[in-house]
Amino acid sequence: MPPEYPEPLSIEHDHPSRELDAGTLRYVIQHVVDAEGTSLTHLSLVLTDHDTVRRLNQSYLDHDYDTDVLSFSLREGPAPSSGASGEGIEGEVYVDLDTAAERHDEFDTSFEREAYRYVVHGLLHLVGYDDAQPAGQDKMREKEDQYLNAVLPAPSS
């Protein structure tokens, strides 16, 4: 009997009351992966809450504040510079659905679209994009908009 391998994508709904459609999540993720010219080796996507994301932010990054998404590469060595790495995405993305629920009105969008933006943002980090500087922030925002507009209905005004 051949060995069993884990699926390249696992989605965990770990929020007590909020969730996103798994089919749409898979579609958004696959679009980003294809557009970036990479593949999924293994991605664990966890949809969770403020407490979990803040605890991870403190434990692993030594940041004592809330954030909307955290990405952790499971690859050895430095992350790729940006764009296709050729190795495939291998990592974990934690999305704070509470932040999406609290902030979506601020950006005149739906809760779902804001949460999908966090998913795309986390993937872009795993591909190698960096938003530590304003130019990187602008590039990532441009990519997020491009990918969301390609796969999701236009936001209502």
Curated annotation (Swiss-Prot):
E.C. code: 3.1.-.-
Stored PROSITE patterns: UPF0054
Principal location class: cytoplasm
Query: Pfam families in the record, alphabetically?
Result: YbeY
Cited SUPFAM superfamilies: Metalloproteases ('zincins'), catalytic domain (SSF55486)
User: Where is this protein found?
Assistant: Cytoplasm
**GO MF, any single term:** zinc ion binding
What's a single GO BP term from this record? rRNA processing
Give the protein's cofactors: Zn(2+)
Q: Which InterPro entries match?
A: MetalPrtase_cat_dom_sf_prd, YbeY, YbeY_CS
Which keywords annotate this record? Cytoplasm, Endonuclease, Hydrolase, Metal-binding, Nuclease, Ribosome biogenesis, rRNA processing, Zinc
What top-level class of enzyme does the UniProt entry assign?
hydrolase
Highest taxon in the source lineage:
Bacteria
Q: Is Glycoprotein included in the keywords of this UniProt record?
A: no
Binding residues annotated for Zn(2+), in chain numbering: 121, 125, 131
Coiled-coil annotation: which residues? none
**Where does it sit, as one GO cellular component term?**
cytoplasm
Query: HAMAP family given for it?
Result: Endoribonucl_YbeY
Instruction: Note the PANTHER family from the entry.
Output: ENDORIBONUCLEASE YBEY, CHLOROPLASTIC
Q: What does this protein do?
A: Single strand-specific metallo-endoribonuclease involved in late-stage 70S ribosome quality control and in maturation of the 3' terminus of the 16S rRNA.
Q: Which family does it belong to?
A: Belongs to the endoribonuclease YbeY family.
Q: What is this protein called?
A: Endoribonuclease YbeY
Native source species? Salinibacter ruber (strain DSM 13855 / M31)
Which taxonomic lineage does the organism of this UniProt entry have?
Answer: Bacteria, Pseudomonadati, Rhodothermota, Rhodothermia, Rhodothermales
